[in-house]
Amino acid sequence: MPRVKRGVTAHARHKKVLKKAKGYYGARKNVYRVAVQAVTKAGQYAYRDRRQRKRQFRALWIVRINAAARQFGLSYSRMMDGLNKANVEIDRKVLADLAVHDITAFGQIAEKAKAALAA
């Protein structure tokens, strides 16, 4: 069985990690042992934050809808209850976008929610 020298594969592996660590500060960008830790931790943060991003955007949409709904005399929860009763199926992302960019359309939707709550 011939002897396998792993210089080529080790170099390729090091190069791959150091390429991912490009732009990092200090030893993290050019010392393999430190770069491995930094890249691994970055991957953990990325994995966690891809999930957190969904929660954070939903929270942002709710804040925007609540602020706009209060201009029309409704709280967020009353607005959503009214929309459910009126069978209006607009998701929070679209509602928040309307609240920011087209307040008149949002106002019409808010009036529908109010009417459904009164009925």
UniProtKB/Swiss-Prot annotation:
Keywords: Ribonucleoprotein, Ribosomal protein, RNA-binding, rRNA-binding. The lineage of its organism: Bacteria, Pseudomonadati, Pseudomonadota, Gammaproteobacteria, Chromatiales. It comes from Thioalkalivibrio sulfidiphilus (strain HL-EbGR7). The keyword Oxidoreductase does not apply. Binds directly to 23S ribosomal RNA and is necessary for the in vitro assembly process of the 50S ribosomal subunit. It is not involved in the protein synthesizing functions of that subunit. Gene3D superfamilies: 6.10.160.10, Ribosomal protein L20 (1.10.1900.20). GO terms for cellular component: ribonucleoprotein complex; ribosome. This is Large ribosomal subunit protein bL20. GO terms for biological process: ribosomal large subunit assembly; translation. HAMAP family: Ribosomal_bL20. Pfam families: Ribosomal_L20 (PF00453). The keyword Cell division does not apply.
